[in-house]
A protein has these predicted regions:
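Structural core segment of the AMP-binding/adenylate-forming
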Residues: 1, 6, 73-74, 97, ...
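Conserved AMP-binding/adenylate-forming core of the ANL superfamily
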Residues: 23-28, 33, 44-89, 93-97, ...
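Conserved AMP-binding A3 loop
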Residues: 56-58, 190, 197-221
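AMP-binding/adenylate-forming catalytic core of the ANL superfamily
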Residues: 113-116, 120, 130, 342, ...
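Conserved pre-ATP/AMP-binding loop-to-beta segment of ANL
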Residues: 157, 178-201, 208, 231-238
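Conserved AMP-binding/adenylation subdomain of ANL enzymes
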Residues: 220-238, 246-286
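Gly/Ser/Thr-rich phosphate-binding loop
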Residues: 260, 282-290, 299-373, 407-408, ...
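Conserved C-terminal "lid"/linker of ANL adenylate-forming enzymes
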Residues: 489-496, 504-508, 517-598
Length: 598
């Protein structure tokens, strides 16, 4: 009965979400409007805490207005695309707000990218300017002669509090701003709900990074529902946000949610398990936007005085695995863990509205779990050629029907968007978004008859590591670009004690003894971000393919780097090294006992 009455109390928060109507496409519902509304109400309240800085809503709004006017005077118009390549800090937020105020599109670049992936993201976006933080100027400088933004006036450099000098090829942004010209802009009145707010790059299911299109209405809908039914915070709360703002979790579930209710945000460049609870007490962070990996790190820390009586009461995020959930919630006395599930490019959101355990919750969208053959990497169909639904609690491929209430914005690349759509699934003419994820239904007890779900795994050509989606095809192309590597087969493998899957690659060599591992290691380091670098390399005799020449991954994935199953030579990349070395049983034992440091 206790659970029944608790659930009745949840109803008052759930009903507004179920009744929520998306903003009219032509209405003035944008991130900029939401921010300006909160500024009017809470002008002198803290907006952002960062290192030794505190910005009020009023200060941030004035800075964003000055920046927006500079952009307009220098040719940036409604609908133009502008690259934002900077670590988490106040001027990242101000830059994003400035762009939104004039209807420009922020092209949010992963700060770990270098080389070809960085070139691709910039050039494929067709951006006219680039805002670069001083801390990321070096990787941008390395590719200047290969990107389509070359004019000094279009490369806007933003100083950091570290000792960086202004590059000769860039313009010092802050020294060119008129901070006296800081009133709200008329241009903001022309920004609508349907306008694109930003591009967030995702590897999707295959190939190079693709730009997912996020309109203002998607940011606002997420912010409204997450704060109402998720965090349940208001303007007196402070959110702990150490996730990268170029990702949808840190941006949509974190920053946008805080802005919607006028709350404060404590932002960090990067997560630190050792200082987490000290920071939480210092800034009285009552809410936390998370990914599961961070929770595992915190739970693996030795108990400390700082974690006791901590202020965090509610958390919203994704990827918290069942084996960590209970331990984390009990140890740190967190009242609400609101796990969500969704994709930047996707058309629906799952949310654990009822604060149940070990579930991504429910959704208002029309969804189906399709029978899927993992070994053959294909959807199973009936004799009529239509897909078959899972009829029990077994995992199935999650598909979400595309319709007026579940719009698929997709990517800027129309061909890539089409590849994510399943057609004629249950009847001729229907269309469903293929998430590429295996999901199952779970019994969570009394839930007003609402079906609840749990994430199981990713399928196909993508795996997730260090909270990043990694495309096996993209990594494979980089590896194949090295001399003596003819064809590599890349896949994700589980590492004990770690979230997601780490990269592993298999390839054959004509001359194993004379293969230049130092040069290969350097090639990997220079061309792949750290999260995408394969941690394990298996040297095989011959590449195994299907009848249609698709690389077979299933057996390789199952054998992983287990030396008891693998007769081939396996090399590994240790956490403190950038060079591959032979995997021996001593290091394998450390990995299996969760003492390797991955």
């Amino acid at each position: 009965m206790k659970e029944f009455f608790r659930m009745l109390g949840e109803l008052k928060y759930m009903i507004p979400v179920l009744r929520y109507k998306w903003p009219d496409p032509d209405s003035n519902a944008s991130l900029a409007h939401t921010f300006q509304d909160s500024t009017e109400k809470f002008a002198e309240r803290p907006f952002v805490y960062f290192e030794n800085e505190t910005w009020t809503y009023s200060q941030a709004n004035k800075a964003a207005n000055s920046f927006a006017r500079y952009l307009v005077k220098n040719g940036v118009q409604h609908g133009d695309r502008v690259v934002l390549f900077m670590e988490n800090r106040p001027y990242y937020v101000i830059s994003l707000l400035a762009l939104n105020k004039i209807g420009a599109i922020g092209v949010l670049i992963n700060t770990s990218l270098t080389g070809d992936p960085l070139i691709h993201c910039i050039n494929s976006s067709d951006s006219i300017k680039c805002i670069v933080g001083a801390e990321r100027a070096k990787p941008l400088e390395d590719v200047l002669d290969q990107i389509n933004i070359s004019n000094k006036d279009d490369l806007l450099w933003v100083e950091d509090n570290k000792d960086y000098g202004l590059p000769v090829w860039a313009t010092d942004l802050k020294s060119n701003l008129d901070f006296n010209d800081d009133e709200n802009l008329e241009e903001t009145n022309l920004v609508t709900s349907k306008d694109t707010a930003c591009y967030i790059f995702t590897s999707g299911t295959t190939g190079v990074p693709k730009a997912a299109v996020l309109p203002n209405r998607k940011l606002i809908a997420a912010a409204v529902n997450i704060t109402k039914a998720g965090y349940r915070i208001n303007h007196e709360d402070c959110m702990y946000n150490c996730l990268p703002l170029y990702h949808s979790t840190g941006l949509m579930l974190g920053l946008c949610g805080a802005i919607h209710v006028g709350a404060s945000s404590f932002i960090k460049r990067k997560f630190s398990a050792s200082s987490f609870w000290t920071d939480a007490h210092k800034y009285n962070t009552t809410a936390f936007v998370y990914i599961g990996e961070l929770c595992r790190y915190l739970d693996n820390q030795e108990p400390s005085e700082a974690e006791k009586n901590n202020p965090i009461k509610s958390m919203v995020g994704n990827g918290l695995r069942p084996d960590v959930w209970d331990s984390f919630k009990d140890r740190f006395d967190v009242d609400r863990i609101i796990e969500i599930y969704g994709a930047s490019e996707g058309n629906a959101l799952f949310m654990n509205l009822f604060n149940k355990n070990k579930t991504i919750g429910m959704t208002s969208a029309d969804v189906a779990l399709l029978e899927y053959d993992v070994a053959e990497d294909e959807i199973l169909k009936n004799e009529d050629g239509y897909c078959k639904k899972i009829s029990n609690h077994e995992p199935g491929l999650l598909a979400i029907e595309i319709g007026p209430n579940a719009v698929f914005n997709g990517y800027t690349d129309k061909d890539a968007s089409e590849k994510k759509i399943l057609r004629n699934v249950f009847k001729d003419g229907d269309a469903w978004f293929n998430t590429g994820d295996l999901i199952k239904t779970v019994d969570v007890g009394f839930a007003f008859g609402k079906e609840h779900y749990q994430f199981v795994d990713r399928v196909g050509d993508t795996f997730r590591w260090r909270s990043e989606n990694v495309s096996t095809n993209e990594v494979g192309e980089i590896l194949n670009g090295f001399t003596d590597v003819n064809m590599s087969n890349v896949y994700g493998v589980e590492v004990p004690g770690c979230e997601g899957r780490a990269g592993m690659a298999a390839f054959s060599l004509e001359d194993v003894k004379n293969f230049n591992w130092n040069a290969f290691s350097e090639h990997v380091e220079n061309n792949l971000p750290k999260y995408a670098r394969p941690l394990f390399i298996r040297i095989i005799q011959e590449m195994d393919t299907t009848g249609t020449f698709k690389l077979k991954k299933n057996e390789l994935r199952d054998e992983s780097f287990d030396l008891n199953k693998v007769n081939d030579i396996v090399y590994c990349l240790k956490p403190s090294s950038n060079s591959y070395e032979l995997l021996d049983r001593e290091w394998l034992d450390k990995i299996n006992s969760c003492k390797a440091g991955y």
